[in-house]
Each structure stands twice: as C-alpha cells, then as structure tokens.
Design a protein with these regions (language model features):
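N-terminal pre-catalytic segment of deacetylase/amide-hydrolase enzymes
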Residues: 2-130, 139, 301-328
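Histidine (H) residue identity feature
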Residues: 5, 37, 65, 70, ...
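Conserved short hydrophobic patches within well-ordered secondary structure
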Residues: 6, 131, 158-159, 274-277
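Residue-identity detector for glycine
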Residues: 30, 57, 74-77, 121-124, ...
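Short acidic/polar alpha-helix capping motifs at helix-coil junctions
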Residues: 80-83, 105-112, 132-138, 174, ...
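Active-site beta->alpha N-cap acidic-glycine motif
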Residues: 92-190, 209, 216
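Catalytic domains of cell-wall/extracellular-matrix polysaccharide-remodeling enzymes
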Residues: 189-327
C-alpha cells in the first residue's frame, strides 16, 4: 500500500498544473458561493478528482485459497466518493479539498471460501500482525503492554482459559489496553489427540471464560502448538470462529537472544505476515526494536481481527491543502 502520509508531505501533483484554470477557484473558496462553485459543473474538476482516485485510491484484493497458506483473507479498498467530496469541499470553504472515501469490498471475501485455517493476511498491503499466545506466567507482560501502548500498536493476544482464571487482573488489563483477544484453548492440550466431544468442549469452555470474565465474544482460535486437524476447522466454523496459525515463528519459547528474534522476523517480513510470539524475556526486550524495524521498512501493524474482517490498516488522506503550487 502507498504511504499516504509521505505523499501528502511531498507530492506536488503536477497534474494540477496542467489544468490550473479548472482549479483556480479552489484558491478562493471563501469568495465563491456554493451555487457557483465550479465543482458543481466543471468536467475538468471531475477529471482531476478521478486523478486523485488514481493516486490515493486502493483497489480491493480478493480472498483466495492457497495450497500452502490455506485460506488467505481478502482486503477492502478505498473508492473516492466524488459527489460527497464536492459537497464537503464546497461546505468547508477552507482552501482544502475534503476527500470522502467509501470502502470498496472485494468481489471474493473470506466468508465465500470453503472453511479452512488461516496462516497469513492479505498481500494487498504492507501490513503485519503480532500474535501473542499466552498460557503461562505474567512476568513479562507488563513490559510488553507498555511497549505496545507507547508505540500505539494493537496486537492479538490468544489467551488460555486456565491462564485467564488464574491471572484475571492481568487478562483484564490486556483488554483495557485495547488489545485484540482470541482463544488459545484451556490447559494447552494437543487438539489433534482429543476426541471430537472434548475438542468441542475446549472451544465452548474457553469461549465462556473469555465472555464471562473479560466480556469478549470470541471469533478466533489459535490451537496450542499449532496442532489441529479438519475437525477443529469444522467445529470452529460452526461457532463462527476462524482457526489461526502463523507465518513466522520467533521461536522465543527457546529463549533466544533478542537479535535472533529480530533476524527471524526480518527474514519473514512480507505483506500479510502473522508473527507468532510469547511473553518471554527475549520478546519483551526485542519488541521495541522489532516494531521500529517493521515500521522503518514501510509496514503498518494490525490485529488478527482486522485481518479476518478484511479491513485495511491505512486510510487515504481526508484533506489535501490547495496552494498555487499544487496540493500538499
């Protein structure tokens, strides 16, 4: 996805210079009545707005099934609402172009695909997701939450039901911090070894704990150790849940040095990557630098819920300042 903030700061929009007469009235919005404003009838102005769509708009990306990554969610795009943009600009009278964007849904969405697990998000934008599986302890969670808060990042915490009951205050703190929450089962069993009845109970019991203790209506399940089979997909689908795996494993459970975690993430940094981590000392120490590294490479961060709901992580600019030299 384009970096909208960068373009807002440096784009001169040479296209406007080729039709200065069509835009000259924008430079004196306060002197022109709404009724006589050329936006209401200027074909040239409409052509220029179409160029704004070309520059800042985003086409949706369809969901698809992949032989390696299983179900890959789609991604909604952004379409400029020209009539609403005209109306908002006329009303504002502040020498700014007020852009109104509509969500453009993919033709093929995730819900249209046959049920399957998800290992990555859409490749349609440069975004990645931090997913943190929590089944034991809370020693390193405060530092991780502090980093996420400071960096204004929302991750997805997959919480074990037994852990929630024994660390309720910390679990509630995660929710209060605005973090995304999913299910990690209860007791960290191997889902593939469970009978179907016990597997169904894993989903239901954990969902009940998350709902009654944290107020979470859970739609995500990350199987412990990534062990699952088709029964989990079917049972989760029956409960309107998505089975979530990962693209990149930090192997932080092996307690590596922070630079090892950073190297593994760097080597797997691709659009839509789901990055698996746990609340360990290594992760807590690596997290600030990891977030900076991801952003320095032009990526944004989003939650797993955003991924399965096919929400883009960045919206095009809502205003563009109008100056004789072009748009800023």
């Amino acid at each position: 996805m384009r970096s909208f903030h960068r373009r807002r700061n440096c784009l001169t929009f040479a296209l406007l210079l080729t039709s200065a007469s069509a835009w000259s009235s924008f430079f004196a919005l306060g002197k022109v009545s709404a009724e006589s404003h050329p936006l209401a009838k200027s074909e040239s102005s409409l052509n220029e707005l179409s160029k704004v769509q070309e520059e800042f708009g985003v086409k949706p990306t369809d969901a698809k099934h992949d032989s390696v990554w299983h179900n890959v969610p789609g991604l909604s795009g952004w379409m400029l609402n020209v009539p609403a943009t005209e109306a908002a600009t006329r009303q504002a009278r502040d020498q700014k172009l007020h852009l109104v964007w509509n969500s453009a849904l993919p033709k093929v969405s995730l819900k249209m695909l046959p049920a399957d697990s998800i290992y990555r998000g859409s490749p349609g934008e440069k975004s990645v997701t931090l997913m943190i599986n929590v089944s034991w302890g809370e020693e390193y969670l405060p530092k991780m939450l502090e980093t996420l808060h400071k960096e204004n990042v929302r991750a997805t915490f997959f919480l074990d039901g037994a852990w929630v009951k024994s660390h309720l205050q910390m679990a509630r703190h995660i929710v209060e911090e605005g973090q995304d929450v999913g299910s990690h089962g209860t007791g960290h069993p191997d889902f593939k070894t469970l009978t179907e009845d016990r597997l169904a109970r894993q989903l239901d019991v954990t969902n009940t704990i998350l709902n009654t203790r944290l107020g979470i209506q859970c739609s995500l399940i990350a199987p412990p150790s990534g062990s699952y089979d088709g029964r989990l997909v079917r049972l989760a689908t029956d409960r309107h849940m998505h089975v979530i795996l990962w693209t990149a494993d930090t192997i932080d459970w092996k307690k590596p040095q922070p630079d090892v975690i950073l190297a593994r993430v760097r080597n797997h940094l691709t659009p839509g990557a789901l990055i698996l981590m746990h609340p360990t000392r290594s992760t807590a120490e690596a997290l600030p630098q990891l977030i900076r590294m991801v952003r320095d490479k032009g990526y944004t961060l989003k939650t797993v819920s955003d991924v399965v709901e096919e929400k883009p992580s960045v919206k095009p600019p809502e205003t563009l300042a109008l100056h004789p030299g072009g748009l800023k």
